[in-house]
Amino acid sequence: GQLDKVTSACNRLAEMDVRASLFIDPDRLQLDAAVAAGAPVVELHTGAYADMEGEAQLVELQRVVDAAHYGHELGLIINAGHGLHYHNVAAIAQIPEIVELNIGHSIISRAVFDGLAMAVSEMKRLITEARSG
């Protein structure tokens, strides 16, 4: 695969004091590869979770939970994102190993109607409530 190329890129970035972050599926093999490549940070792809409903979404949520826990045990900084919005962010925000959520599209879409300050404030409230409860 691409491990040699990714490792080389991670090394070049590290030489410039830049932390590489790899966007990966919530999968143990990809987490192992991220460690092998020398990436200190990963962003777990939450798109499949965001696209699903019902039981299938719960199964995918568990994949994200398990991946976040495993990646944290490996020493990685765990972020998550893609497809997260006001109605599905809470379950992901509750995962304690996740340091940062990358949410953009839904906030900007909401901002068209409610203004950016209101859109950001509401998303922040949802994340804060999920993390404190």
Task: Give, region by region, the residue ranges found by the protein language model.
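C-terminal active-site rim and adjoining tail of enzyme catalytic domains
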Residues: 77-86, 102-105, 127
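Charged helix-capping and loop-helix junction motifs
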Residues: 1-5, 56-65, 117-121
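C-terminal helical cap(s) of enzyme catalytic domains, especially alpha/beta-barrels
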Residues: 57, 110-132
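Glycine- and other small-residue-rich loops at beta-strand/loop junctions that grip anionic moieties
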Residues: 23, 60, 81-82, 112
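Histidine/lysine/aspartate-rich catalytic loop segments that bind and position anionic ligands
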Residues: 18-74
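Glycine-rich phosphate-binding active-site loops on the catalytic face of alpha/beta enzymes
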Residues: 42-53, 97-116
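Catalytic cores of alpha/beta
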Residues: 27-37, 80, 84-98
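Surface-exposed amphipathic alpha-helices with a cationic face
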Residues: 7-17, 35, 65-73, 124-131
